[in-house]
Amino acid sequence: MKLENLKSKEGSRHKTKRVGRGFGSGIGKTSTRGSKGQKSRKSGHTRPGFEGGQTTLYRRIPKIGFNNKNFANNYNVVTLNNIVKLNLANVDKKVLVEKGLIEDNKLPIKVIGTATISKPISVSAHKFSKGSVATLEKSKSKFVVIK
């Protein structure tokens, strides 16, 4: 089988409709648009939601809610389980970037979750969840809060 011998399945391909190419084609002159009116003009279609000049539904309904995403505190979230899997004594921002556990180097780091820790480790991050603090204290590990 060669590339030039391939044929598409019967009925799967249609010829493109070439409109406005003379009377003999059957779709010349008005090009299937009808004779007059807004939709027959070149830019005759209205935007989505247009109601003929009447105030549209999305503008009649009052605005509700509030979005605080511009002022939200975003963190690089790292699970304590992933930190334990690294099997290192000291874990800080530099190590987390090298190992690929955090993507954005500019954002602060938050450690969450619980894990079984066999030997004490030292973790430095900007924030810790209550569960992660309890787990680290239980295993006599050190956690440093970065300012």
Curated annotation (Swiss-Prot):
InterPro entries tied to this protein: Ribosomal_uL15, Ribosomal_uL15/eL18, Ribosomal_uL15/eL18_sf, Ribosomal_uL15_bac-type
Annotated SUPFAM superfamilies: Ribosomal proteins L15p and L18e
Biased composition regions of type Basic residues, renumbered to the chain: 36-45
GO biological process, any: translation
Location of the region described as Disordered in the Swiss-Prot/TrEMBL record: 1-54
Biased composition (Basic and acidic residues): 1-13
Cellular compartments per GO CC: cytosolic large ribosomal subunit
Keyword annotations of the record: Ribonucleoprotein, Ribosomal protein, RNA-binding, rRNA-binding
GO function term, MF aspect, one: structural constituent of ribosome
Keyword 4Fe-4S: no
Coiled-coil regions listed: none
Highest taxon above the source species: Bacteria
HAMAP family: Ribosomal_uL15
Subunit structure of this chain's protein: Part of the 50S ribosomal subunit.
Function comment: Binds to the 23S rRNA.
Protein family according to the UniProt entry: Belongs to the universal ribosomal protein uL15 family.
Protein name, per record: Large ribosomal subunit protein uL15
Organism: Malacoplasma penetrans (strain HF-2)
